[in-house]
């Protein structure tokens, strides 16, 4: 506030004091009250009734039909000199109008203060309506915030004209002086409302009604519409004030030493271009005030919906640091120090969904050449290069043309080819992050609702560039997938089918710049033209096994989308892909005389027959009816040759396992499980492949050898979650075998044939509950443990140990070595012998009476499932879903709860009952130490491949899987926590050692297992 006094000529000794405020001191946000919209036309021309029926499109624009149609007002603040938007738009909320007019009476507050605007700043009012779910401008109004006549801030009520789109003054008509277009009566009435005239109640009651009547007669009708608004009124006039800055001069270095106490630097603010910026105190002549032309750019960054807070200093630093022309030559020779290398390694192991900080992005950018030059895929010791490319792509600014050109014209073409791309990185590039419609969203749009012709050309060019670069990345990922063999591709097929959703969002969606979309390379209007869809269909047509699972995966997703139309995303993508696959498969088989298409039709027929059989059983019997009757009915039905299940019309591959040819079933070995859903156990008749050297004589024709394949068919449960877990277990098994570590896992086959049905392989087994409750013969119980045995009697009589002794005589032949199906690096020579990690010494269990082969299977499988179920957070573990096969392999079943979810209270992080340890010989036996060593090797091996596993879960976030949809935002975080990536390898091993000790000594899980067994007993 300031006070000026000046002498008058008539009274020389008298002074008049004028009190006013300065705009630079007014630290208050600009606020506007939107009152109402006045229509000066008595008869508004509306569309006649006949036109409504002739042209239904008129209904899209409600202002042509209703006099008081729904409208909303959007307010922006502009800098008058350059007409730059300097605030976030604000708009009125929805208001239902009546027949009296369009009245809002809503107070709006903008996110810019009065002391941040210049004297030429003005408000733009965009009156909009909704047409085809998008805002469309009805009219615009302008009001300058300062009056140039008096350099004062406008306040009080104002009546401003509304310019329609066909008005010649529509583009811009801003009055900086006295507002014209108002009658003398209107001016006086506004002055009265603004408080310039005293209010007398007795006089107002007499005069105001007559003024209103006169006002209606003499109202200005130069415009069809007028908008009435109110600005805040202040106690004093607000006069515009700014600071004139002097050109800085260069001072000697010796004179620029700081003479300011540290505390003083925090106590002063100076104003640069009417915006407060904390700086050092200005009384020191050695510190100069410099205008930053980029400051207004940072002020507008908050309009980015993906941004939270912005620091102008950080943004300026990033811009200067990434100046391509200045530091490219220097960056090529940069090498990180040991401390920086450790920091970069920590950044590289971050999951794909983790947000990188500005410092981390700058660090990745700084050493981009170092990582790109050392990205040789055949160097196993170079761990830091792993996952660098996706992290680098996440660290660049996609809105910066320099960074984009540098990345896609120099870094990727010269340093990154398909051979050097990790398979996990390729999967990450196919995720939802690399989408041009999110990466290419402009930082802000300058009044994009005004008209189509006023869109910025730079936004269009930038989006086209981002679109083409994203398409290039996705093609690069597909090219990497082409290097994988069909068996390896099958490990990721479930996630690749999910990735088709993200392809659809890119290739099906119309680009925002439709009129020039022809500039976009390879722009496809259909998902069928996406590189990933083309690749998967092509490989599925050529390889029958891959095509088998591709068909069922796509079929299930298609049915799920049709049954859940509320799910976001295009609903026809899987239907189109499925039809295209069948069409190409049929043509390919006809041209090459292959039976793949005929086999697929037989598989569909087989699933339909099983479905009708289950429905027939449910219709014929009640839920609580005896299971024996259902079994008898099932066997009679299967034995009836008229039902075509005893002997199929033609052999065909089993959908659950295409390597198995089935030709019929064994009715006497089929059954119905005791359950309300009545799942079937069908023992199929298989045709075994003939081995070389066992060919029969051709004199009597070909003779086939038959085998058995038991499976379960279930309707009523969604098996996709179990299918995902088994797929991850199978992948982990291959990763371990790739390191020469075969843990004898049992990833049994499971296939969802619809969202509510599926097939499950039936593996011979017994539950631990039944094994521990059995009584074994004395010959088995004391067959082991001679005089030299140190095993306690309680351990020697363990049910699991007795079970292994019982089956030791049956399993004397050692299984062949199982190799990984994962392809080695393409750059590695085939003659080079891979370096394998040192393995624990073989288990010797002669003192326990168990075959070394069975005990080896048991110890390894226990270690494998112990680690895997911990990483996946498998819950609801009890002795009924912990299984043991006659070959000694321990395994888990029923994955209804994963990612840490569990129906029981206080679930353990790892399910490792003490009875399982006793089956090895107890806590003090050598087998227990071997078990722990296998656990440690398994855990460290999977930690090294955590990026691949996390990327697979990342692609499943939009899948309709219960435990993923329960909290999709924390799925990756939950899995990542189990890997303990922030720890060193030694710390991780110690962490897992503590987990094993806690699980073995836990008391609560033992109690819960007893209660569960008791509950199962009473249910039986």
Swiss-Prot record:
Catalytic activity annotation: a 1,2-diacyl-sn-glycero-3-phospho-(1D-myo-inositol) + ATP = a 1,2-diacyl-sn-glycero-3-phospho-(1D-myo-inositol-3-phosphate) + ADP + H(+)
Gene knockout outcome: Leads to defective acidification of the vacuoles and a lack of growth at pH 8.0. Vacuoles are considerably enlarged and electron-transparent. Shows aberrant patch-like accumulation of vesicles, which are localized in the periplasm close to the plasma membrane. Shows a staining of punctuate structures, possibly multivesicular bodies (MVB), that are scattered all over the cell, the result of a late block in endocytic vesicle transport. Results in significantly lower carboxypeptidase Y activity. Causes disturbance of normal nuclear migration. Also leads to avirulence in mice.
Alphabetized SUPFAM superfamilies for the sequence: ARM repeat (SSF48371), C2 domain (Calcium/lipid-binding domain, CaLB) (SSF49562), Protein kinase-like (PK-like) (SSF56112)
Keywords, in A-Z order: ATP-binding, Endosome, Golgi apparatus, Kinase, Membrane, Nucleotide-binding, Transferase
One GO term (biological process): positive regulation of transcription elongation by RNA polymerase II
Family annotation (SMART domains): PI3K_C2, PI3Ka, PI3Kc
Subcellular location(s) per record: Golgi apparatus, trans-Golgi network membrane; Endosome membrane
Region (Activation loop): 892-913
InterPro entries cross-referenced by the UniProt entry: ARM-type_fold (IPR016024), C2_domain_sf (IPR035892), Kinase-like_dom_sf (IPR011009), PI3/4_kinase_cat_dom (IPR000403), PI3/4_kinase_cat_sf (IPR036940), PI3/4_kinase_CS (IPR018936), PI3K-type_C2_dom (IPR002420), PI3K_accessory_dom (IPR001263)
Lineage of origin: Eukaryota, Fungi, Dikarya, Ascomycota, Saccharomycotina
UniProt topology in membrane: Peripheral membrane protein
Molecular function per GO: 1-phosphatidylinositol-3-kinase activity; ATP binding; protein kinase activity
Start and end residues of each stretch annotated as Catalytic loop: 873-881
Enzyme class: transferase
Assigned protein family: Belongs to the PI3/PI4-kinase family.
Record EC number: 2.7.1.137
Protein name according to UniProt: Phosphatidylinositol 3-kinase VPS34
Coiled coil feature spans: none
Domain PI3K/PI4K catalytic stretches: 666-1004
GO cellular component, one term: nucleus-vacuole junction
Modified how: Autophosphorylated.
Keyword Protein biosynthesis carried by entry: no
Limits of the C2 PI3K-type domain: 49-210
Function noted in UniProt: Multifunctional phosphatidylinositol 3-kinase involved in acidification of vacuoles, pH-dependent cell growth, and autophagocytosis. Plays an important role in protein transport and virulence. Component of the autophagy-specific VPS34 PI3-kinase complex I essential to recruit the ATG8-phosphatidylinositol conjugate and the ATG12-ATG5 conjugate to the pre-autophagosomal structure. Also involved in endosome-to-Golgi retrograde transport as part of the VPS34 PI3-kinase complex II.
UniProt region (G-loop), positions on chain: 672-678
PIK helical domain mapped to chain residues: 331-577
């Amino acid at each position: 506030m300031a006070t000026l006094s000046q002498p008058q000529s008539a009274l020389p000794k008298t002074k008049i004091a004028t009190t006013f405020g300065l705009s630079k001191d007014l630290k208050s946000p600009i606020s506007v009250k939107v009152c109402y919209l006045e229509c000066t036309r008595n008869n508004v021309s509306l569309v006649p009734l006949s036109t409504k029926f002739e042209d239904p499109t008129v209904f899209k624009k409600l202002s042509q039909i209703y006099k008081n149609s729904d409208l909303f007002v959007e307010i922006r603040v502009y800098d008058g000199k350059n007409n730059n938007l300097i605030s976030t738009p604000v708009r009125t909320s929805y208001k239902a109008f009546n027949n009296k007019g369009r009245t809002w009476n809503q107070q709006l507050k903008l996110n810019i203060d009065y002391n941040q605007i210049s004297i030429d700043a003005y408000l733009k009012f965009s009156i909009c309506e909704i047409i085809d779910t998008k805002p469309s401008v009805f009219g615009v109004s302008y009001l300058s915030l300062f009056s140039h006549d008096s350099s004062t801030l406008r306040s009080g009520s104002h009546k401003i004209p509304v310019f329609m789109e066909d008005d010649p003054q529509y583009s811009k008509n801003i009055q900086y002086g006295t507002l014209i277009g108002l009658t003398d009566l209107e001016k006086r009435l506004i002055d009265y409302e603004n408080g310039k005239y005293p209010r007398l109640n007795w006089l107002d009651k007499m005069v105001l009604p007559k003024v209103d009547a006169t006002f209606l007669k003499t109202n200005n009708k130069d415009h069809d519409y007028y908008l009435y608004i109110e600005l805040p009124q202040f106690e004093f006039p607000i006069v515009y004030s700014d600071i004139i800055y002097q050109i800085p001069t260069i001072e000697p270095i010796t004179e620029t030493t700081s003479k300011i106490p540290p505390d003083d630097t925090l106590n002063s603010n100076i104003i640069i271009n009417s915006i407060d910026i904390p700086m050092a105190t200005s009384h020191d002549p050695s510190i100069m005030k410099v205008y930053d032309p980029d400051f207004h750019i940072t002020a507008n960054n908050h309009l980015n919906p993906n941004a939270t807070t912005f620091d102008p200093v950080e943004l300026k630093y990033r811009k200067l640091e990434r100046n391509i022309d200045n530091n490219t030559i220097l960056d090529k020779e940069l090498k990180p120090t040991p401390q920086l290398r450790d920091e970069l390694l920590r950044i590289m192991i971050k999951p794909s969904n983790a947000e990188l900080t500005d410092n981390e992005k700058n660090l990745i950018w700084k050493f981009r050449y170092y990582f790109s030059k050392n990205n040789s895929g055949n160097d196993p010791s170079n761990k830091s290069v792993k996952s660098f490319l996706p992290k680098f792509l996440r660290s660049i600014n996609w809105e910066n043309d320099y960074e984009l050109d540098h990345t896609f014209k120099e870094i990727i073409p010269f340093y990154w080819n398909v051979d050097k791309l990790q398979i996990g990185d390729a999967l990450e590039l196919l995720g939802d992050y690399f989408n041009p419609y999110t990466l290419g969203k402009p930082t802000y749009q300058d009044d994009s609702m005004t008209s189509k012709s006023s869109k910025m050309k730079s936004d269009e060019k930038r989006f086209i560039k981002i679109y083409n670069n994203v398409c290039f990345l996705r093609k690069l990922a597909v090219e990497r997938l082409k290097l994988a063999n069909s068996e390896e591709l099958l490990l990721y097929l479930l996630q690749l089918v999910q990735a088709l959703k993200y392809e659809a969002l890119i290739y099906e969606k119309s680009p925002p710049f439709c009129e020039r979309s022809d500039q976009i390379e390879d722009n496809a209007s259909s998902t069928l033209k996406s590189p990933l869809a083309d690749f998967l269909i092509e490989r599925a047509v050529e390889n029958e096994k891959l095509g088998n699972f591709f068909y069922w995966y796509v079929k299930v997703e298609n049915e799920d989308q049709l049954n859940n139309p509320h799910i976001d995303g295009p609903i026809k993508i899987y239907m189109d892909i499925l039809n295209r696959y069948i069409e190409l498969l049929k043509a390919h088989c006809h041209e090459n005389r292959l039976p793949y298409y005929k086999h697929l039709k037989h598989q569909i027929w087989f699933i339909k027959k099983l479905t009708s059989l289950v429905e027939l059983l449910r219709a014929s019997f009640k839920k609580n009816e005896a299971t024996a009757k259902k079994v008898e009915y099932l066997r009679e039905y299967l034995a009836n040759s008229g039902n075509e299940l005893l002997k199929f019309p033609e052999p065909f591959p089993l959908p659950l396992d295409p390597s198995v040819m089935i030709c019929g079933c064994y009715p006497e070995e089929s059954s119905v499980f005791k359950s309300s859903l009545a799942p079937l156990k069908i023992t199929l008749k298989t045709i075994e492949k003939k081995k070389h050297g066992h060919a029969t004589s051709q004199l009597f024709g070909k003779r086939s050898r038959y085998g058995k394949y038991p499976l379960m068919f279930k309707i009523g449960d969604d098996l996709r979650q179990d299918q995902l877990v088994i797929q991850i277990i199978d992948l982990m098994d291959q990763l371990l075998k790739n390191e020469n570590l075969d843990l004898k896992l049992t990833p049994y086959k499971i296939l969802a044939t619809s969202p509510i049905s599926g097939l499950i392989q039936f593996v011979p087994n017994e539950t631990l509950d039944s094994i521990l409750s059995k009584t074994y013969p004395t010959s088995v119980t004391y067959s082991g443990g001679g005089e030299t045995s140190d095993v306690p009697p309680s351990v020697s009589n363990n049910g699991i140990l007795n079970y292994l002794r019982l089956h030791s005589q049956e399993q004397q032949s050692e299984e062949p070595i199982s190799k990984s199906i994962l392809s080695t690096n393409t750059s590695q020579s085939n003659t080079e012998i891979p370096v394998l990690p040192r393995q624990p010494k073989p288990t010797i269990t002669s003192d326990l009476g168990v075959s070394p082969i069975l005990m080896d299977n048991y110890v390894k499988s226990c270690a494998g499932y112990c680690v895997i179920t911990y990483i996946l957070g498998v819950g609801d573990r009890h002795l009924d879903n912990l299984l043991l096969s006659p070959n000694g392999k321990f395994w888990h079943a029923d994955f209804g709860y994963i990612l840490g979810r569990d129906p029981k209270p206080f679930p353990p992080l790892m399910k490792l009952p003490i009875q399982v340890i006793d089956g090895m010989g107890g806590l003090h036996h050598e087998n227990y130490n071997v078990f722990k060593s296998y656990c440690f090797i398994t855990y460290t091996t999977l930690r090294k491949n955590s990026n691949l596993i996390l990327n697979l879960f990342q692609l499943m976030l939009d899948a309709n899987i219960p435990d993923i949809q329960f909290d999709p935002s924390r799925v990756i975080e939950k899995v990542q926590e189990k890997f303990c990536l922030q720890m060193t390898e030694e710390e991780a091993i110690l962490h897992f050692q503590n987990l094993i000790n806690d699980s073995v000594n836990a008391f609560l899980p033992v109690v819960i297992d007893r209660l569960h067994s008791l509950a199962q007993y009473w249910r039986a």
